[in-house]
């Protein structure tokens, strides 16, 4: 401890590393790069300064006056500039410093030891600069236990002092904090959250002595979850009072403490900070935005949750009761998520979501309506706070007719909800409904950034399951398709990404047709023969998977095919679906039935005989009544696919240079970042953004017709209005599609469309683009290659894959889940 921190405290290079006496220095090499969010929480380039002290032996260079025996600081400076510029976002000063130090030690064998400091001045608005100091010694990785992250000149106002005049007015103090970054720790200390916690603590507390202040700040930092894992890490905290003695720039004290020392110490005011609830905000008592009366339509966002009985039915009933009110209109409903209970853990998992409503009610009147639905209509019994409940309806945000956030601070109602920023099960569904630029009215930060901050903590209880309801079956528990998405650290880039970590669903193709492109006539037989084939198919799939989706088709949808009549399609498919559902030889709790149809009447008949999923290759484009049928059955899953034209014209419509929605699009986002800030992505993503916009347009029509978001999966339509190269590009760009959103003008109002959390189905099986690459003219010869493509689809984020060769592709899926998701 003393070696490292004496180096840091006195001067960066005051203690020679590795016994070296010769050094080459580069002082404050200036460059601009993105270091994660800046002072204004924007991903903009920041100026950073790199200083290097490189221990070497230049005796030979000094004797010969020949540069080749020395470290060329001009070349090193150029190489460092090039190295830093190659990455779009380093994420933090610490990540940049760690990467630069490794780069220097790997590239320049003449560097025997290194002392590196990376400094940035605009990382946090409260601090003059944040820096990271890395020390390395070649051949002796254990020479130092810690690197250091330094927070300099952290400015705050607080009450401090023993004199009466000091107790009446807050005064400025600055803190210098040195955070140890253990060499064995993969991640650096969480600088942003530590600063926020320290600032909140100091500014909401008061002290008589600087000694109490510095000790308490050390305790606040020590109680951070990060340092609980490293109890022997030395924390250095220095405080200066800037106005105590006017003839000085400041007076104060400093201390070095280890978390284990502070754990048993009772620090005053520490109860005001608690890591589990992070930073709570106090709502202003003043209200600058007027609350309009009953004659004006306003907007509100309500969070709903249930964990008693039939949770989904309770949620449906609550939404129906809201919609029956003349003063309330349901505008948009989020996906449904399952979450582990917070606070009181010993209870059933919750089912959660958010709904956006238009209302003539005031906030207090809307609260009364919510309580009426909870306690009178659905008979909620509240035994204690945060306990089980049949239904919970909370007002999360309230906006006036101009779209301005309303702040309410009353004994029985706080808006925005004071604990919403602690809960992914509120923020995740809410962020499906609001634009990434929507600011929290109190913190003035984008709400989506608060969600990211929760996920970055990597707490298991913040991980959610997306649920897609399936119809109720007699004797079977309520059924759902389940998709688990988690934030994972990329061990190579150091960045966090949202990826699906639940098993991929296998959808087995069963074409009861004489003319499908690869298996026409194969299952075009009597019901008994078809059922035997289904039983074998299920056995093959369930050997490795918990469930299987059987996708029955009664009409070929291959491009340019002659379409069977509606009556013929019904004759081929409906009796078969009925037989499958009634079969006692099939494990009905593991068999999910789908019908591949674009006709609403066929879908309606299939629902009557037990189908769970409507797989519509047209996305409602071929039959205007399809959405009405889906809306009438809110427990039916609907796969909304992308195509253009019709069966006979789609192959001529694979040109995507111009955006179909044109000027109606106002703003586009990828991973919640405005596309205008992503110059390197704009030209490369024209195809997938076109597909995303056209899926979004059909999504809007579905929602306008009463379809619920929780019903919808999306399929970008491989092979439909796509060239072979475009099919490959779509597979590669699935991560963009799953994180694509946009705002657009629709019916004289602004609509936000968000594809986040939409499970994606891909159907590459035996398709022509595979044969184009493998030279397999016969579609049936493409099964082996299909297995490889299926694995790639999963690697790029597909949640469900549609295949012909169930037995072998089920193995490909299982392997891909193990490789890309770490599942066994």
UniProtKB/Swiss-Prot annotation:
N-acetylserine: residues bearing it: 2
Keyword Magnesium: yes
GO BP: folic acid biosynthetic process; tetrahydrofolate biosynthetic process
Region span, DHPS: 506-824
GO CC list: cytoplasm; mitochondrial envelope; mitochondrial membrane; mitochondrion
Residues found modified as Phosphoserine: 286
Top-rank taxon: Eukaryota
Residue span(s) of domain Pterin-binding: 504-814
Ranges for region DHNA 1: 22-144
Positions bound to Mg(2+): 511
Pfam families assigned: FolB, HPPK, Pterin_bind
Location within or outside the cell: Mitochondrion membrane
Cofactor(s) annotated in UniProt: Mg(2+)
Biological pathway: Cofactor biosynthesis; tetrahydrofolate biosynthesis; 2-amino-4-hydroxy-6-hydroxymethyl-7,8-dihydropteridine diphosphate from 7,8-dihydroneopterin triphosphate: step 3/4; Cofactor biosynthesis; tetrahydrofolate biosynthesis; 2-amino-4-hydroxy-6-hydroxymethyl-7,8-dihydropteridine diphosphate from 7,8-dihydroneopterin triphosphate: step 4/4; Cofactor biosynthesis; tetrahydrofolate biosynthesis; 7,8-dihydrofolate from 2-amino-4-hydroxy-6-hydroxymethyl-7,8-dihydropteridine diphosphate and 4-aminobenzoate: step 1/2
Keywords attached to this entry: Acetylation, ATP-binding, Folate biosynthesis, Kinase, Lyase, Magnesium, Membrane, Metal-binding, Mitochondrion, Multifunctional enzyme, Nucleotide-binding, Phosphoprotein, Transferase
Annotated region (DHNA 2), positions in chain: 147-284
Subunit structure: Homodimer. Interacts with NAP1.
Function per UniProt: Catalyzes three sequential steps of tetrahydrofolate biosynthesis.
Family to which this protein belongs: In the N-terminal section; belongs to the DHNA family.
Name of protein: Folic acid synthesis protein FOL1
Organism listed in the record: Saccharomyces cerevisiae (strain ATCC 204508 / S288c) (Baker's yeast)
């Amino acid at each position: 401890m003393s070696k490292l921190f004496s180096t840091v405290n006195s001067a960066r290079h005051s203690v020679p590393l590795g016994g070296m006496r010769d050094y080459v220095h580069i002082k404050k090499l200036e460059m601009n790069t993105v270091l994660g969010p800046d002072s204004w929480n924007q991903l903009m380039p920041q100026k950073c300064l790199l200083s290097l002290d490189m221990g070497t032996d230049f005796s030979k260079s000094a004797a010969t006056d020949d540069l080749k025996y020395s470290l060329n600081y001009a070349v090193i400076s150029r190489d460092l500039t090039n190295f830093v510029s190659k990455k779009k976002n380093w994420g933090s000063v610490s990540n940049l410093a760690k990467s630069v130090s490794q780069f220097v030690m790997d590239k320049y064998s003449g560097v025997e030891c290194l002392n590196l400091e990376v400094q940035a001045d605009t990382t946090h608005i409260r601090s003059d600069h944040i820096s990271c100091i890395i020390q390395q010694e070649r051949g002796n990785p254990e020479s130092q236990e810690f690197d250091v992250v330094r927070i300099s000149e952290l400015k705050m106002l607080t009450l401090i002092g023993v004199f009466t005049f000091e107790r009446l007015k807050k005064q400025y103090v600055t803190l210098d904090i040195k955070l140890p970054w253990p060499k064995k720790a993969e991640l650096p200390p969480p600088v942003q959250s530590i600063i926020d916690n320290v600032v909140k603590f100091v500014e909401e507390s008061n002290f008589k002595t600087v000694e109490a202040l510095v000790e308490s700040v050390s305790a606040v930092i020590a109680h951070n979850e990060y340092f609980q894992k490293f109890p022997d890490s030395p924390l250095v905290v220095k405080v200066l009072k800037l106005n105590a003695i006017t003839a000085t720039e400041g007076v104060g004290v400093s201390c070095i403490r280890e978390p284990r020392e502070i754990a048993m110490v009772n620090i005053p005011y520490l109860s005001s900070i608690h890591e589990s609830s992070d930073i709570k905000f106090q709502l202003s008592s003043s209200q600058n935005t007027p609350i309009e009366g009953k004659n004006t339509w306003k907007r509100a966002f309500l969070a709903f949750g249930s964990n008693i009985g039939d949770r989904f039915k309770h949620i449906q009933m609550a939404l129906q009761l809201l919609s029956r009110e003349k003063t309330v209109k349901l505008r948009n409903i989020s996906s449904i998520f399952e979450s582990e209970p917070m606070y009181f853990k010993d209870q059933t998992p919750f089912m959660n979501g958010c709904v956006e409503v238009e209302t003539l009610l005031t906030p207090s009147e809307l609260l009364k309506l919510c309580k009426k639905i909870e306690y009178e209509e659905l008979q909620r019994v509240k035994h204690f706070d945060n306990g089980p409940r049949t239904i919970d309806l909370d007002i999360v945000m309230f906006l006036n007719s101009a779209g301005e956030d309303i702040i309410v601070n009353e004994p029985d109602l706080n808006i925005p909800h004071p604990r919403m920023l602690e809960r992914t099960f509120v923020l995740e569904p809410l962020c499906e409904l609001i634009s990434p630029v929507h600011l929290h009215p109190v913190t003035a930060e984008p709400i989506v950034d608060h969600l990211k901050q929760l996920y970055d903590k990597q707490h298991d209880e913040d991980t959610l399951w997306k649920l897609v309801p399936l119809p109720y079956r007699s004797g079977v528990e309520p059924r759902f398709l389940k998709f688990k998405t988690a934030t994972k650290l990329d061990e190579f880039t150091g960045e966090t990404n949202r990826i699906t970590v639940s098993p991929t669903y296998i959808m087995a193709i069963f074409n009861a047709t004489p003319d499908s492109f690869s298996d026409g006539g194969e299952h075009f037989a009597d019901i008994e023969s078809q059922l035997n084939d289904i039983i074998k198919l299920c056995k093959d799939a369930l050997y490795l998977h918990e469930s299987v989706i059987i996708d029955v088709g009664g009409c070929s949808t291959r491009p340019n095919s002659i379409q069977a009549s509606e009556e013929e399609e019904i004759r081929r498919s409906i009796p078969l679906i009925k037989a499958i559902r009634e079969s006692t030889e099939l494990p009905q709790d593991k068999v999910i039935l789908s019908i591949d149809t674009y006709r609403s009447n066929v879908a309606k008949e299939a629902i009557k005989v037990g189908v769970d999923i409507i797989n519509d290759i047209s996305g409602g484009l071929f039959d205007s009544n399809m959405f009405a049928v889906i809306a009438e059955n809110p427990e039916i899953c609907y796969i909304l696919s992308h195509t253009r034209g019709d069966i006979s014209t789609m192959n001529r419509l694979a040109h995507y240079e111009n955006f179909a929605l044109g000027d109606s699009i106002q703003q586009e986002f990828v991973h919640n970042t405005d596309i205008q800030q992503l110059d390197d992505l704009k030209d490369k993503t024209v195809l997938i953004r076109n597909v995303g916009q056209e899926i979004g347009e059909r999504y809007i029509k579905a929602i306008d017709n009463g379809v619920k978001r929780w019903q919808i999966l999306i399929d970008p339509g491989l092979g439909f209005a796509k060239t072979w190269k475009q099919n490959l590009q779509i597979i590669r760009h699935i991560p963009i599609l799953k994180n694509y959103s946009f705002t657009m003008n629709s019916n004289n109002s602004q609509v936000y469309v968000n594809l986040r959390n939409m499970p994606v189905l891909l159907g590459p099986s035996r398709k022509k683009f595979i044969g184009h690459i493998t030279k397999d003219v016969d579609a049936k010869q493409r099964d082996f290659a299909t297995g490889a493509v299926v694995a790639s689809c999963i690697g790029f984020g597909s949640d469900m894959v549609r295949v012909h060769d169930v037995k072998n592709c089920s193995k490909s899926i299982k392997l891909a889940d193990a490789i890309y998701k770490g599942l066994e």
